[in-house]
């Protein structure tokens, strides 16, 4: 499995930096020429020719210990539609533990839920597929959130939205 990561992460020092540079990481960049040529060719080779898995965290979906699914951006779905490959939808459940991790946080247990895969529809355009896949992925994550936490998803902030947080907003 390959992982897409921001190109600036490759400058990290130590063991994590070593992993970033040598553990099947694919850099993503703001450089338009790189993205249109090298990145595109790399994904095409890995997804279409070699049938590899590629992990792409959709933009702005990763917030530290934030339980709620974030409304997605189109990037990962664009490439899935472009290369006619499925999205393996996932939701990470976060359970607060009793032990402290830091002064501000309790330890958190992470449970990965693999949801139904989402396939492009061969009758639709790449554009329509990317938007439909994005919508379906969000719907699945919303449903998982509501089933796991036993409450409807809304975006009014409460302390419990941040897993393990011992603080208060008051």
Identify what each model region corresponds to.
Residues 1-33:
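Catalytic core of membrane glycerolipid acyltransferases/transacylases, capturing the structured
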């Amino acid at each position: 499995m390959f992982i897409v990561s921001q190109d600036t992460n490759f400058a990290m020092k130590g063991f994590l930096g070593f992993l970033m540079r040598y553990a099947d990481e694919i850099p993503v960049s703001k450089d338009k020429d790189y993205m249109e040529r090298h990145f595109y060719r790399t994904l095409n080779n890995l997804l279409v020719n070699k049938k590899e898995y590629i992990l792409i965290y959709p933009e702005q979906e990763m917030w530290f210990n934030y339980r709620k699914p974030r409304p997605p951006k189109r990037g990962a779905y664009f490439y899935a539609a472009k290369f006619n490959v499925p999205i393996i939808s996932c939701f990470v459940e976060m359970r607060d533990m009793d032990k402290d991790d830091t002064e501000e946080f309790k330890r958190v247990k992470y449970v990965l839920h693999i949801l139904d895969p989402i396939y492009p529809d061969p009758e639709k355009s790449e554009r329509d597929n990317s938007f439909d896949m994005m919508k379906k992925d969000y719907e699945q994550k919303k449903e998982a959130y509501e089933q796991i936490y036993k409450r409807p998803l809304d975006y009014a902030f409460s302390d419990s939205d941040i897993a393990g947080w011992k603080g208060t907003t008051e």
